[in-house]
Amino acid sequence: MRNRFDTQLELLNKKLVIMGEMCEKIITLAAESFFQGKVDKNTISEIGKEIDDSEKEIESICMKLLLQQQPVAKDLRQISSALKMITDMKRIGNQVENIVDLATNLDSTYAENYLSIGRMAESTIRMVKLSIQAFVNKDLEMAKEAKLYDDIIDDFFCLIKNDLISIIHQNPDSGEYAIDVLMIAKYFERIGDHATNIAEWVEFSITGMHGE
């Protein structure tokens, strides 16, 4: 019985890795849509659907583990954490769709002034990758490392926000463009928040304590 349970847990880990890779890919596409002005909405929609399908598949695996097996406390933490993590990964996909909607109508020549948004995207990708690896490897230090990127993302957002406020004061006609860029930065910040949530659920799965 335990061997079967461990096999299902291994499958759960594999599915989480795949879903995490989808999130990394879709965040990369969001950044490209901002900087290159080329938005492949079909590809992004397809990945978004794959993320949704992965969420349902992982939910099903978790429910079977809970109902058909007899998980001990640490197993329950791992399963419940996985359920929380996939919710945040799905929301990352939703934030990307918001970014792409704004980037579609944005002149990409202005994007060169906001390379910090690219750094925000890179940081969120790193957070997701580290968090999923930490979950699979039960590596508490790796989960803590992932959380460190949240402050970096917040700092970049503050820099961008202050810069845009200054631009609006100097040139009120640029207000609409500035607001779109600010919202894109805000969506990346929210992706960072979801990635932080993932790391915190990894910590919970290992220690039984959340949000420390």
Where are these regions (language model features)?
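Cytosolic, long alpha-helical scaffolding segments
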Residues: 1-212
